[in-house]
């Protein structure tokens, strides 16, 4: 570093970093988004009159004036051959973590919320750095969707310090969510508040997973749910596996049609996080086996299910009060049983598991009625 600091250098940046780069009068403008380093004391340069500039030689020192100097560490680095430099390791590509970022900062603007005509929910705001120097401050728009948009609109306020993680993208945001002079946005997947007393090295941090590992940041032990800060998408699955009683399990509800097909498979009980099995890493599925979760069944569905149970019990106990259409249904959607007085219909594919062994034997064709 000491050798580099003694050189006279200048850095020229492309318009990607300076929008008004055309007004920079020094040096040649670079059109590609890169930074180049030029040394003014370059060997073989020319002087203003066209003659080649000769390098000045330092005056010879007498032996008495020479002071022993300890070799600089940079000299050994410069002498390193290419064969001694190891090739970076290869890792498997994971689409879920591609362009994934973590941000900690302050909410710069009130959250804007919108419900679109197709039933989708969107919210947006700006997360900013707060620095003593105005020249170093910057902000990034963040977008929420779905239930997380409603959560952000309800709980997030201006000047809150929050942690968000999600996908970084450059695209047009949803309607009424455009922020001038910025195309880079983050589609938030996880949202957390920062504890007021928690130490932070800077008011705004962007850290990748590898940087966290290098800096020695380790996963904290399980704590109360209000103190948990989930930094990455995979941490949500870790928390689910380590604390299954803090999550609702909707897998059976989805199979039975009690919730919509796109409903999350798991949802935290404080409704701050949702997880889908089709987006889970490969290591998650084996660890879910044997875990006990709480199952939340919608109230309206519970009433309907209890009512259905009574109907099946009545069928088993009083089969003569029901028409049995199992033997010759012409319409596949027609009910298998129908009450002779009330007209209530029952389908075998919706029956509880205990019903099938207790059903009466199939009646003869002439005794059945077809609808």
Swiss-Prot record:
Residues 45-64 are annotated as: Disordered. Residues 1-20 form a transit peptide. Residues 97-195 form the SSB domain. Residues 312-360 are annotated as: PDF region 2. One of its GO terms (biological process) is DNA replication. It comes from Arabidopsis thaliana. GO terms for cellular component: chloroplast nucleoid. The keyword Transit peptide applies. InterPro entries: NA-bd_OB-fold, Primosome_PriB/ssb, ssDNA-bd. Residues 237-289 are annotated as: PDF region 1. This is Protein OSB2, chloroplastic. PANTHER family: PROTEIN OSB2, CHLOROPLASTIC, SINGLE-STRANDED DNA-BINDING PROTEIN. The gene is OSB2. Keywords: Chloroplast, DNA-binding, Plastid, Repeat, Transit peptide. Expressed in the floral abscission zone.
